[in-house]
Amino acid sequence: MSRLDSMLRRLTAQRDGLNWAAEQVRNLAGDVLDIGLGNGRTYDHLRETLPDRRVRVIDRVLQCHPSCVPPEADFLQGEARPMLDKLAQERSPIILAHYDLGFGVKEKDIAEAAALSPAIAAVMAQGGVIVSGQPLVGFDELDGPQGIPPGRYLFYQVR
């Protein structure tokens, strides 16, 4: 498979997974969280898919496309753990989180996701859903939507 085909499959799976997750939490009260803004594609999709929800964002730096810059009040700039801790203190429940942090080194990415899992759990609402590119620890894994190859994206629910 070409790199282009692989990227298209990944992005399609991401979009389909986010749409599925948004439907799962439609009746819950709370905000949305994008952990890892990057160029802003996912943030843009989340704010369009869930227009009545506040979409919070965590990232080390603001480097997204100009059309995807979150409002200053919704952008928590810094390392993920202290930003998650800050968000937890606000007591604004997160009903849907997208986890997309990584260094590009599989072992390091998996370790980081595991280390951040308790801090992610601290901000999540009961019944909330997490869509993640990395395995998280301490959540109930869901099957997710049909058509997404196993392991492409991971889906979790907070019980």
Language-model regions: role of each:
Residues 92-102:
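Short SAM/SAH-binding signature in class I
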Residues 28-38:
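Conserved class I S-adenosyl-L-methionine
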